């Protein structure tokens, strides 16, 4: 069985605005079924969605059992107003508003909570993020509130201090995790954080002219080196493509290929262990 522990059913890997517009007047069931058929044909038995506020992931979860797939979704991801994530998630201004949204997720039947706590990689400039992460105290409160409500927490997080803060706060999984240093990697390993590095979002940019290829190569090399280091620390790693992101189609197998390249002969055992932990925590 294959796992993809980070997808966005609402997106299509080509144009995020057009992809979202496809579902603005109602979720297109035929589209969702087509993607599920693709995953089924490739042997995927578990999918974890990063969320959307239009109900696309929710419908996919409802339909997935027909295709022999276990599907988990946070419904809409939660992001702080004025920071990255508003294009796909629900915004909050204060921790009180965040807590109310988490409680709402419980009533709506979310499987877990997804938080956005940093910016994105700038694929034209190695080492640069589009914005700084949230402060350590805020991250700690976000994780605590969701855990108090009984949810596991998936965190979009880049940058060493942001990821370290998330790990120390007890976050259940870190997504992306660009530009980590030894302290951040050790914090995740010691806390038992599952890292989903989404290498496909970088590797699939190679050979395309949208971004500076020198920067893309440097970013990918850095990420793969950190994957190797994290594995050597005994850290938990799980495969997740971020399917739907630009140049990452649904049903992509590139994540497995990149992680095999980074991890070597033990790659299957390492990924199976991490994926099973994702399945357990985000049940």
PLM regions with names:
Residues 2-63, 82-84:
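Metal-associated gating/positioning segment near the N- to mid-region
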Residues 29-58, 68-78, 110-123, 152, ...:
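Divalent metal-dependent hydrolysis catalytic cores, especially in the metallo-beta-lactamase
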Residues 52, 90-100:
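Glycine-rich anion/phosphate-binding loops
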Residues 13-17, 163-169, 202-213, 223, ...:
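Histidine/acidic-residue-rich catalytic or RNA/ligand-binding cores of hydrolases
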């Amino acid at each position: 069985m294959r796992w993809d522990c980070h997808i966005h059913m609402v997106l299509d890997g080509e144009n995020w605005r057009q992809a979202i517009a496809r579902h603005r007047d109602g979720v297109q069931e035929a589209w969702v079924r087509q993607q599920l058929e693709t995953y089924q044909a490739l042997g995927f038995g578990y999918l974890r969605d990063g969320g959307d506020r239009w109900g696309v992931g929710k419908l996919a979860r409802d339909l997935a059992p027909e295709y022999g797939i276990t599907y988990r979704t946070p419904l809409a991801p939660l992001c702080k107003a004025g920071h990255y994530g508003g294009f796909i998630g629900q915004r909050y201004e204060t921790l009180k508003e965040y807590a109310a949204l988490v409680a709402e997720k419980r009533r709506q039947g979310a499987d877990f909570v997804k938080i956005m706590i940093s910016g994105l990689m700038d694929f034209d400039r190695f080492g640069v993020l589009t914005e700084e992460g949230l402060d350590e105290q805020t991250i700690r409160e976000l994780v605590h509130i969701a855990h108090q409500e009984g949810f596991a927490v998936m965190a979009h997080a880049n940058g060493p201090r942001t990821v370290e803060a998330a790990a120390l706060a007890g976050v259940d999984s870190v997504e992306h995790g660009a530009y980590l240093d030894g302290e951040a990697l050790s914090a995740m390993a010691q806390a038992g954080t599952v890292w989903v590095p989404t290498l496909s979002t970088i590797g699939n940019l190679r050979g395309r002219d949208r971004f500076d290829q020198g920067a893309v190569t440097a970013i990918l090399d850095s990420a793969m080196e950190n994957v190797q280091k994290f594995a050597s620390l005994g850290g938990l790693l799980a495969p997740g493509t971020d399917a739907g992101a630009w140049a990452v189609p649904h049903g992509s197998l590139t994540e497995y290929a990149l992680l095999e390249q980074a991890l070597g002969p033990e790659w299957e055992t390492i990924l199976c262990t991490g994926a099973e932990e994702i399945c357990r925590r985000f049940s």
